[in-house]
Amino acid sequence: MDKIKGVFFDLGGTLRIVEKVPEHQERAKVRMAQLAGREDVEAFINMVEARYEPYREWALGENREAGDYELWHQWLLPELGEERLRAVCHEMTYQYRQVKGLRHVVEGGLQVIRGLYERGYRLGII
């Protein structure tokens, strides 16, 4: 049998977990609404969430995810306009992830990664 040369990790729930922190999540919602020029934060977030479901189905069916601009331009906020979206799409994606909660490396995760790396394994993230 061939020797194992590499190890791939899945970030979500394997190396990284999401902690629900309501204050953090609310700040992210407010920031998203600000970036989009919307005053009704909850209505805006609800709209984005509703639009995210068809995108997620598409992404799973295509086995790929859209880049930040494509995500917001084609799926989540096409009415914002190309120029504005190009200026804010990366932060919008970041804030949308923060709406779900704070992400942390799992306990012992860093030590596992360092140990595998020091033993010569190639490491990857899926």
What do these predicted regions represent?
Residues M1-E49:
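Active-site neighborhood of HAD-like aspartate-dependent phosphohydrolases
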Residues E19-P22, A59-G61, K100-G101:
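Short, solvent-exposed loop/turn segments at secondary-structure boundaries
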Residues H24, R64-D68, G101-G108:
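Soluble or luminal CAZymes and related metallo-dependent hydrolases
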Residues R27-R31, L71-W75, Q111:
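Alpha-helical elements of Rossmann-like donor-binding domains used by nucleotide-donor carbohydrate transfer enzymes
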Residues A36-D40, L80-G81, G120:
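Glycine-centered loop/turn motif at secondary-structure junctions
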Residues A50-T93:
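A metal-dependent, Asp-based hydrolase signature
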Residues V88-H104, G109-I126:
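Substrate-recognition element of Asp-dependent hydrolases with the DxDx(T/V) motif
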